[in-house]
Amino acid sequence: MPAGGRQEEARELFAPLGPTYDRVGAVLSLGQDPLWRRFLVSRLPPGGHVLDVATGTGLVAEELLKRGFRVTGLDQSPGMLALAGQRFGHRVELHEASADALPFDDKSFDHLTVTYLLRYMDDPRATLAELARVVRPGGLVASLEFGVPGGPARPLWELYVNVGLPLAGRVLANGWNEVGGFLGDSIRDFWARNPIERQLEWWRDAGLSDVQVRRLSLGGGVVMWGTRI
């Protein structure tokens, strides 16, 4: 999970939820989150060393291992990293650090994945540039974020995030009622401030080319990926 400002708020909110994160996260996304994560990983060409940023309990890292990648995971939450360590043992090298100050040299990794991070960062443009810094030329950076559906799906999305998410969070597990109430505002605010055209500028400014965008599940999930120049 991410960490000062929006980062600190998110870290404090999610920190105690590690033991139930995988199960409840899948339910709150109506079963879509695992599908989105698999699609994210499928964007990468086979082989190589991948840095998985905001690795959390290791859901994306696990998909990367299944596809034969060497994986390094990074997160700011020691609790989440402890759960990832239990999941992987020595199969994944784990680091506790901030995504906007990575403890790696330039061009250290073949590819990079990042999940549900940028909307929590105080300067997402600078964070994306920092992520791209550690990827070798020709490598891919791939990001998964929650999105805001358009068209006829928008009213249904608003109903779900305003009523369904908080209620479901309250029923499913302790602590998740606050997350349910927090997520809708967080997602809506991020996309209002940062429409896709602005985000594409971030990617280009970070030295990423051929940037592609795929909206999944009527726009509830958004995967972006681009090649490091």
What are these regions (language model features)?
Residues 100-112:
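A short acidic, Gly/Pro-enriched loop at the edge of an enzyme's catalytic core
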Residues 1-20, 161, 172, 176:
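N-terminal, positively charged/glycine-rich alpha-helical extensions of SAM-dependent methyltransferases
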Residues 30-47:
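Conserved alpha-helix/loop element of class I SAM-dependent methyltransferases that forms part
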Residues 110-124:
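A short SAM/SAH-binding and catalytic strip from SAM-dependent methyltransferases
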Residues 207-229:
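Core SAM-dependent methyltransferase catalytic element
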Residues 125-140:
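A short glycine-rich, Lys/Arg-flanked "PGG" loop and its adjoining helix->strand segment in the class I
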Residues 148-202, 212:
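C-terminal alpha-helical "lid/dimerization" subdomain adjacent to the S-adenosyl-L-methionine
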Residues 49-101:
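Class I SAM-dependent methyltransferase SAM/SAH-binding core
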